[in-house]
A protein has these predicted regions:
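N-terminal alpha/beta PP-like core and its mobile active-site loop of ThDP/TPP-dependent enzymes
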Residues: 1-259
Length: 259
């Protein structure tokens, strides 16, 4: 898993170790300087650190926690990433199969169904069925995190398959998924002409800038368009700073959070 994450451009994993997730730590050690682990004091901190890493790097943030009571503490940080469309891969584990019956008897603190708990704040959740499915699982997680409207995903790696040795075929990671936007949509010529016509006919046009303008790397183009048309621009909270706030055409942040 550590090698696959490094293939997708991840250079740091934020988390709190546990016995169930030790294979990830051994893998990070084996990868040398390609990827490192940063110890956090709390699982909640790990999710916010992964969120910040994704925002700053333009890639995917990764956090990890142990089974059950560790992984479910991801919820507040993943909720922020979900609401603001930040690509994060959260990694948890699961107890051995003979422990799972305790989930229904209320005697196992680490047998909480993490996938169900985190489902409302993640785009996608999956469980590793066999170690040979690891390349497919991590690639799907990365693709889900950065495609469409980006957001967090959750991977659960049960005790036994997480400790098995990979014996599957050679694989090649899709490095296009290493940063945003992974797949940039291209409008047709007709759509471009239509947009130009709408702008020409507008009497007092105003731009509204959202977080997608940040993640698409379009700051320079947006500034050039605003200046060429003398068009003021307002921003949502996540679009704050796309057009510098000291720019003469900046209207600041709109809504109750604006000024």
């Amino acid at each position: 898993m550590a090698g696959l994450l490094a293939d997708y451009g991840v250079t740091a994993v934020f988390g709190v170790p546990g016995g169930q997730t030790l294979p990830l730590y051994y893998g990070i050690l084996d990868e040398g300087n390609r990827i490192r682990h940063i110890l956090m004091k709390d699982e909640i901190d790990a999710t916010f650190a992964a969120d910040a890493y994704a925002r700053i790097s333009g890639g995917i943030g990764v956090c990890d926690a142990t089974a059950g009571c560790g992984a479910i503490k991801f919820i507040s940080g993943l909720a922020e990433a979900y609401n603001t469309s930040i690509p994060v891969i959260a990694i948890g584990s699961e107890m051995e199969g003979d422990w799972l019956a305790a989930r229904y008897r209320g005697t196992g603190s680490q047998v909480v169904d993490s996938k169900e708990v985190l489902k409302p704040v993640t785009k996608w959740q999956a469980c590793l069925p066999h170690v040979n499915k690891m390349p497919e699982l991590v690639q799907t997680a990365a693709q889900m995190a950065v495609s469409g409207r980006p957001g967090p995903v959750f991977i659960e790696c049960p005790w036994r398959p997480f400790r098995e040795e990979y014996t599957g075929p050679d694989y090649e990671s899709n490095r296009k998924l290493a940063s945003l936007p992974a797949h940039r949509p291209t409008p047709s010529r007709d759509e471009i002409d239509e947009a130009i016509q709408v702008l020409k006919e507008a009497k007092r046009p105003v731009m509204l800038l959202g977080g997608g303008a940040w993640r698409s790397g379009a700051r320079a183009e947006i500034t050039a368009l605003a200046e060429r048309m003398a068009m003021p621009a307002a921003a949502s909270l996540t679009g704050k700073g796309v057009l510098p706030e000291n720019h003469p055409l900046s209207l600041g942040v709109v809504g109750s959070l604006g000024g």
